[in-house]
């Protein structure tokens, strides 16, 4: 292996180890990237974007572990209920569930939040987003509370009792209602 490749491999290995420990990041170690991070180095550096999170951590009596949650991203903050954002999607790894993608293909607009949760909670999160929309937003021009929410999954089954169905509508409501700008925890 050439010395340059070995040096890069060592640098990347050290970066991964220190980042996992919460220390310096690649940019801080001199690895060049295009652009400059925002003041928070977070998605909320984009004007108007708000994020809400609910994390569920519980050790159950039968030794199962709950390690899951919900993240809600509102691209225009609370205005996301009335003001659409241009949007598109793609399959990063060829599988995984994401609701609302047919409407993104057809209309090219996101009408509301993006919600992320575990694989087996996509359905409850989708339904909760629609319920939240009806309870908190105004009807559209036709008089309907119309929504095809964008809810995506991530597999957390190695860490979480994914078959326990621990994510409930209330968790989704809390993430949506708690969405704010500023630092993302």
Which residues does each PLM region occupy?
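Bacterial N-terminal signal peptides
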Residues: 7-17
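Alpha/propeptide regions of enzymes that mature by internal proteolysis
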Residues: 21-185
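Positively charged n-region of N-terminal signal peptides that target proteins for export
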Residues: 1-5
């Amino acid at each position: 292996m050439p010395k340059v490749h070995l040096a890069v491999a060592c640098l990347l290995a050290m970066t991964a180890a220190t980042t996992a420990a919460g220390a310096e990041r690649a940019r801080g170690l001199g690895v060049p990237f295009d652009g400059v991070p925002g003041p928070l180095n977070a998605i909320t550096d984009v004007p108007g974007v708000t994020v809400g999170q609910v994390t569920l951590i519980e050790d159950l009596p039968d030794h199962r572990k709950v390690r899951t949650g919900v993240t809600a991203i509102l691209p225009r903050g609370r205005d996301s209920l009335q003001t659409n954002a241009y949007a598109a999607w793609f399959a990063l790894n060829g599988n995984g569930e994401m609701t609302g993608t047919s409407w993104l293909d057809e209309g090219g607009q996101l009408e509301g939040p993006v919600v992320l949760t575990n694989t087996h909670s996509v359905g409850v999160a989708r339904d909760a987003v629609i319920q939240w929309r009806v309870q908190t937003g105004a009807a559209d021009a036709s008089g309907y509370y119309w929504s095809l929410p964008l809810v995506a999954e991530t597999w957390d089954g190695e860490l979480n009792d994914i078959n326990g169905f621990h994510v409930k509508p209330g968790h989704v409501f809390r993430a949506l209602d708690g969405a704010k700008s500023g630092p993302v925890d």
